[in-house]
Amino acid sequence: IGSGVESMSRAPYAVPKPERGFPTGNLVMYDTTLGWRFVNPKMQALYGTESMGETAENLAEMYKIPREEQDRFALLSHQKAVRAWDEGRFQDEVVPVPVKRGKEEILVEQDEGPRRDTSLEKLAALRPVFREGGTVTAGNSSPLNDGAAAVLLVSDDYAKAHGLRPLARVRAIAVAGVPPRIM
């Protein structure tokens, strides 16, 4: 069984454990919505602790990608995603999941990220959110969403023996990576 939850809307503020029983002075409190909870100085020196939005700023600076180009790309991305959903192109890739809300059951079957109503004007009106004087906004970056996923991975024999009907099959895997400051 593999699972995970990310609740960006309810990420807590965290205070690290003090080094001694009754510390004097002020304690540092971390906002855990973006980035690391408790920064290890050695890890920070080696890899950085930038959030995804900050790494996008690093890439924009490194490759000299202007704000207008980012907004145009974001608009096209939203338009393509909305069109793909409308045309049913994700039908074979997304498994609708029933979720109980009290006595009612709803079917979660679509990503809420793509904005049907966005425009270049709306994107241009947004302020940078990750860096003073930056170019990455809430409209041209990945959204901060709540989400969860779980998977039960079993063999065909196990599924048959227990009357399980597969929702998906693992056909292949791949691994790739880049330095953390430009992910």
PLM ranges: what are they?
Residues 59, 63-64, 159-163:
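Phosphate/pyrophosphate-binding loops at sites that engage ATP/ADP/AMP, CoA/4′-phosphopantetheine
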